[in-house]
C-alpha cells in the first residue's frame, strides 16, 4: 500500500508540540500555543520550545543576552548578500545565506548554542537584504530591543508601537512550531544522515519556499486586493467556488474546526488596525466566505486558517508581501532547531520504500 504524501503516517515521537485537529488545539510543550502567544514574549516561547519549560527570570535574561549577542552579521555574510542579484527572491537569498553559516564548527551532534545563533541571526539577514535591495543604509542590531522589536527596527529604522510589536510578536510565536509539517520533516530527514544543523535548516528553508507550504499569506493578500471593496466580495467568492477553486485562507489539512492561531491573530489584528479599512474588508470577506462555503461545500466546516489573519496582521504593521514567508521562516527557525535537536537524541536515518511501477526485464534462460 502506498501512502501518498505520507498522510496519516507517524514516523517520530515528539514532546515539542501537538496538534489536535478535531478540537482545534495547538499545544507547545504542554501549554496552549494561543495562551503563550497572547501572554508571553517571543523569547519565552522560543525558550519553551527549545528547552521544554518556560524560563525563570534569570534564565530568560541569559537567553535574551545570548540572542542579542548573536545578531551581528559576519563580514563574509554581508558581502555574500551584496553579491546576490537584486532580482533573486528573498527566500532563495535566505536559503543561500544561511547555508554559508555552516562553518566547520557545525557538525553532528547539533548544539543549542548553534540553534540560538541561527534564531538570532536570521532576522538580521532578512533585514539587511531588504534594505540593501532598496538602496537603504543597513541598520545595526540594537541590544536595547527584544527579538521582535529588533527585527522591526532593523527593517524600518523605527521602534514599533506597542500594538504593532505585540501583533508581530503574536504572529511570530504562532509561527514558531507546528508539528511534522513538510519543512520540519525535511530538517529531520537531513539531520538523520548525521549531517549538521545548518544543512538541516537549509533544507527546511528550501522546502518552505514552495507555495504550498510558505506562500499562503501572500495569496490571501492578493485575494483581498482583487476584491477591493466589500460590495464585490460575494460575487468574487461565488465565482471562485463555482469554478471549484480554493479560497485562500480557509480550511486546513489538519484542523477540522477553528484554527486556534487564527483566533489569536484576529484579536491582535483588531487591536493594531482598529477601524482600518483593510481589516474591515478582511472581516467582511471572512463572514461572506464562511456563509458561502456552508452553501457550496455543506458539511465540510471550513473555517479561517492562520494564513488569513497572518496576512491581516502583516498588512496592519506595514510589512509588504515579500516579507511574509521570510518572516514565517525566521519564526519557524525555532521549531526547526528544536526538532533537529530532538532527532539527534535518538537518531535513526529515514529510509522509506517506494513501490516500483516500471517494467521488469524478462529472464533469459541460459
Curated annotation (Swiss-Prot):
Impact after mutating residue 307 to D = 5-fold increase in activity
Gene3D superfamilies per UniProt: Citrate Synthase, domain 1 (1.10.580.10), Cytochrome P450-Terp, domain 2 (1.10.230.10)
Looking up Pfam families in the UniProt record yields:
Citrate_synt
Query: According to its UniProt record, which reaction does this protein catalyse?
Result: oxaloacetate + acetyl-CoA + H2O = citrate + CoA + H(+)
* Active site residues according to the UniProt entry: 252, 307
Q: What up-regulates or down-regulates this gene?
A: By decoyinine and nutrient depletion.
What family does this belong to? Belongs to the citrate synthase family.
Quaternary state and partners of this protein? Homodimer.
Give the protein's recorded name: Citrate synthase 1
Which species is the source of this protein?
A: Bacillus subtilis (strain 168)
Its ancestry begins with: Bacteria, Bacillati, Bacillota, Bacilli, Bacillales
Amino acid at each position: 500500500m502506498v501512502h501518498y504524501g505520507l498522510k496519516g503516517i507517524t514516523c517520530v515521537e515528539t514532546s515539542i508540540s501537538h496538534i489536535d485537529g478535531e478540537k482545534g488545539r495547538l499545544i507547545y510543550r504542554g501549554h496552549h500555543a494561543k495562551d503563550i502567544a497572547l501572554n508571553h514574549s517571543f523569547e519565552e516561547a522560543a525558550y519553551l520550545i527549545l528547552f521544554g519549560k518556560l524560563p525563570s527570570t534569570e534564565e530568560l535574561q541569559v537567553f535574551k543576552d545570548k540572542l542579542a549577542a548573536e545578531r551581528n552579521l559576519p563580514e563574509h555574510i554581508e558581502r555574500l548578500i551584496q553579491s546576490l542579484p537584486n532580482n533573486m527572491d528573498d527566500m532563495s537569498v535566505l536559503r543561500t545565506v544561511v547555508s554559508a553559516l555552516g562553518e566547520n564548527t557545525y557538525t553532528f551532534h547539533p548544539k543549542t548554542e548553534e540553534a540560538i545563533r541561527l534564531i538570532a541571526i536570521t532576522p538580521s539577514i532578512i533585514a539587511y537584504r531588504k534594505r540593501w535591495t532598496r538602496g537603504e543604509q543597513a541598520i545595526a542590531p540594537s541590544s536595547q530591543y527584544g527579538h521582535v522589536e529588533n527585527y522591526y527596527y532593523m527593517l524600518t529604522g523605527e521602534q514599533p508601537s506597542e500594538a504593532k510589536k505585540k501583533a508581530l510578536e503574536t504572529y511570530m510565536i504562532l509561527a514558531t512550531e507546528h508539528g511534522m509539517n513538510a519543512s520540519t520533516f525535511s530538517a529531520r530527514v537531513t539531520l538523520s544522515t548525521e549531517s549538521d544543523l545548518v544543512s538541516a535548516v537549509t533544507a527546511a528553508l528550501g522546502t518552505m519556499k514552495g507555495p504550498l507550504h510558505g506562500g499562503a499569506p501572500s495569496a490571501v493578500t492578493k485575494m483581498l486586493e482583487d476584491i477591493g471593496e466589500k460590495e464585490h466580495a460575494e460575487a468574487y467568492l461565488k465565482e471562485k467556488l463555482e469554478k471549484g477553486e480554493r479560497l485562500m485562507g480557509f480550511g486546513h489539512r489538519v484542523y477540522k474546526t477553528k484554527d486556534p492561531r487564527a483566533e489569536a491573530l484576529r484579536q491582535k489584528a483588531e487591536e493594531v488596525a482598529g477601524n482600518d479599512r483593510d481589516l474591515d474588508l478582511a472581516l467582511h470577506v471572512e463572514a461572506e466566505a464562511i456563509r458561502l462555503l456552508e452553501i457550496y461545500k455543506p458539511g465540510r466546516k471550513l473555517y479561517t486558517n492562520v494564513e488569513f489573519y497572518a496576512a491581516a496582521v502583516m498588512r496592519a504593521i506595514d510589512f509588504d508581501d515579500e516579507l511574509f514567508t521570510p518572516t514565517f521562516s525566521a519564526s519557524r527557525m525555532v521549531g526547526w532547531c528544536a526538532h533537529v535537536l530532538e532527532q539527534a537524541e535518538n537518531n535513526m536515518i529515514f529510509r522509506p520504500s517506494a513501490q516500483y511501477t516500471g517494467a521488469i526485464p524478462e529472464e533469459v534462460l541460459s
